[in-house]
């Protein structure tokens, strides 16, 4: 299922939240509306953690994570780290990373199997990513942009990349990741798909400005509604067959 939301008038959902198959992080905000969108879809399925990182709310841009682990920058306080450890499942590894490129969400794009990272990340950081997240790591650019986490959104089912990514690059990335990819946008034409969207294997949350066309692309490439925990999204299968009959 794909839903639209706003964080205090901002459509950049991926800046203020992080979503994986085993937990969700949501920034602390003045209004509960944003949190309630996640709560409505994820309550009783995975824990949703109200968090700050280094005293800021841009938690989606400062962290990188998947089902197995969460990476946070060294500026994360001990108190914040303890809060994450208390809220997230026990089998999720949480690790601070000492890295010059500290906005980890901008420079790391990953699912539960593969990570694409900024070409200039430290060698040690690469090893920590492989170890904590349990993924294969590739240094990569997306449409000549080094910020892989900003210009790509990825789940275990599929991915969306910067709209100007060439077909050749899409094919290369797709065979590397072993998932289908599509070049697309969010929030009425924004190329920064990583910042405008969070996704796991059964749910995507994107900005309120995202058009119906963009939303349908998101639902189809991420195969949302085909599978979900405890039957979430089973009703969407009917909608898919109706949509197919139009073409």
UniProtKB/Swiss-Prot annotation:
UniProt-listed GO biological process terms: assembly of large subunit precursor of preribosome; cytosolic ribosome assembly; maturation of 5.8S rRNA; maturation of 5.8S rRNA from tricistronic rRNA transcript (SSU-rRNA, 5.8S rRNA, LSU-rRNA); maturation of LSU-rRNA; maturation of LSU-rRNA from tricistronic rRNA transcript (SSU-rRNA, 5.8S rRNA, LSU-rRNA); ribosomal subunit export from nucleus
InterPro entries found in the cross-reference section: eIF6 (IPR002769)
Domain of life, source organism: Eukaryota
Gene3D superfamilies membership: L-arginine/glycine Amidinotransferase, Chain A
Modified residues (Phosphoserine): 174-175
The keyword Disulfide bond appears for this protein: no
Pfam name, any one: eIF-6
Predominant cellular place of this UniProt entry's protein: cytoplasm
GO molecular function per UniProt: ribosomal large subunit binding; translation initiation factor activity
SMART domains linked to this entry: eIF6
UniProt-annotated location(s): Cytoplasm; Nucleus, Nucleolus
Keyword Membrane part of the UniProt annotation: no
Family per similarity comment: Belongs to the eIF-6 family.
HAMAP family: eIF_6
NCBIfam families (alphabetical): eIF-6
Stated role: Binds to the 60S ribosomal subunit and prevents its association with the 40S ribosomal subunit to form the 80S initiation complex in the cytoplasm. Is also involved in ribosome biogenesis. Associates with pre-60S subunits in the nucleus and is involved in its nuclear export.
UniProt name for this protein: Eukaryotic translation initiation factor 6
Source taxonomy: Eukaryota, Fungi, Dikarya, Ascomycota, Pezizomycotina
Gene that encodes it: tif6
